[in-house]
Swiss-Prot record:
The keyword Cytoplasm applies. GO terms for molecular function: ATP binding; ATP hydrolysis activity; ATP-dependent DNA damage sensor activity; damaged DNA binding; single-stranded DNA binding. PANTHER family: MITOCHONDRIAL DNA REPAIR PROTEIN RECA HOMOLOG-RELATED (PTHR45900:SF1), RECA (PTHR45900). InterPro entries: AAA+_ATPase (IPR003593), DNA_recomb/repair_RecA (IPR013765), DNA_recomb/repair_RecA_CS (IPR020584), P-loop_NTPase (IPR027417), RecA-like_C (IPR049261), RecA-like_N (IPR049428), RecA_ATP-bd (IPR020588), RecA_C_sf (IPR023400). Can catalyze the hydrolysis of ATP in the presence of single-stranded DNA, the ATP-dependent uptake of single-stranded DNA by duplex DNA, and the ATP-dependent hybridization of homologous single-stranded DNAs. It interacts with LexA causing its activation and leading to its autocatalytic cleavage. This is Protein RecA. HAMAP family: RecA. ATP binds at G66, P67, E68, S69, S70, G71, K72, T73.
């Protein structure tokens, strides 16, 4: 077959496929397609930088996992607030039945416009999630958590019954069904997950995440969040410092880490992020324990410098603007 006939046959095939499956179902990559990936800011400047595209990619699956009390829910609540600030609709599938509305509100989540579901079984949770995604009406959906998605057979069965592999099969089927729909609807789908220890592992990492391997494979971004240290004011514990590592990314170079301060009651410390990044970019000078901008002293020690910025919102906003401009981040 000549090149001309091949081209005509290809054009005909493309038209037939588009007619059968709808516009956009198939295309040539060079046909004016937008190769840039849309993103919703994570609510953390440091994490937006680590993610490489300024936030969570739309139309993709994201897994956030880590030990208990490391900041997983806080991280996702900030993302939800960020999506709502951009005019997006957010759904929260609360399989753990543990959402604290007051804390969510304190972090900026608009509770009046938050779509909330507290399902009884794993199948119900995933069916609700799929229906919401298919509707095309939401911009972000959060499932909290994969470990709490209990298959119906396990709930209905006896405590002594063996249900090995049920949850993994359920998640595998859900991922196969949902991944295409998530991509078409341009939704950010965030799955929160916990960490478990494999029994009898002598070498290598004994830690694993529940729900089988499907979520690992289908996720475009996997974030591991771990508590690094406590933040104290005198003897009182007022927050934690956590490290978020981009373990996997199909949209940007992975293995970057963001360090964030999570303050009890208020969430991610904006002043802490801006201060650290300003020092990195030499916008703020750090000499010994002192922080200063030219002749203006911000304070001795990181906590005092953070407080100084919080007391001077104009200076904080100015530094944040410079940081965002340098890293090409949107608000």
């Amino acid at each position: 077959m000549s090149d001309n006939k091949k081209q005509q046959a290809l054009e005909l095939a493309l038209k037939q496929i588009e007619k059968q499956f709808g516009k956009g179902s198939i295309m040539k990559l060079g046909d004016g397609a937008d190769h840039s990936i849309e993103a919703i800011p994570s609510g953390s400047i440091a994490l937006d930088i680590a993610l490489g595209i300024g936030g969570y990619p739309r139309g993709r699956i994201i897994e956030v996992y880590g030990p208990e009390s490391s900041g997983k829910t806080t991280l996702t609540l900030h993302a939800m607030a960020s999506a709502q600030k951009q005019g997006g609709t957010v759904a929260f599938i609360d399989a753990e039945h543990a959402l604290d509305p007051n804390y969510a509100k304190a972090l900026g989540v608009d509770l009046d416009n938050l779509v909330l579901s507290q399902p009884d079984t794993g199948e119900q949770a995933l069916d609700i999630a799929e229906a919401l995604i298919k509707s095309g009406s939401i911009d972000m959906i959060v499932i909290d958590s994969v470990a709490a998605l209990v298959p119906e057979a396990e709930i209905a069965g006896d405590m002594s019954a063996n249900h090995v592999g049920l949850q993994a099969r359920m998640m595998s089927q859900a991922m196969r069904k949902m991944s295409g729909v998530i991509s078409k609807s341009n939704v950010v789908a965030i799955f929160i997950n916990q960490i478990r220890e494999k029994v009898g592992v002598m070498f290598g990492n004994p830690e694993t995440t529940p729900g089988g391997r499907a979520l690992k494979f289908f996720s475009s971004v996997r974030l591991e969040i771990r508590r690094a240290e406590a933040i104290k004011q005198g003897s009182e514990m007022i927050g934690i410092k956590s490290n978020v590592k981009v373990v996997k990314s199909k949209v940007a170079p992975p293995l970057k880490t963001a360090s964030i301060d999570i303050m009890y009651g208020t969430g991610i410390s904006r002043s802490g992020e801006v201060l650290d990044l300003s020092v990195e970019l030499n916008l703020v000078n750090k000499s010994g324990a002192w922080y200063n901008i030219g002749e203006e002293k911000l304070g001795q020690g990181r906590d005092n410098a953070k407080q100084y910025l919080e007391d001077k919102p104009e200076l904080l906003n100015e530094l944040e603007k410079k940081v965002r401009t340098h890293f090409k981040l949107t608000k």
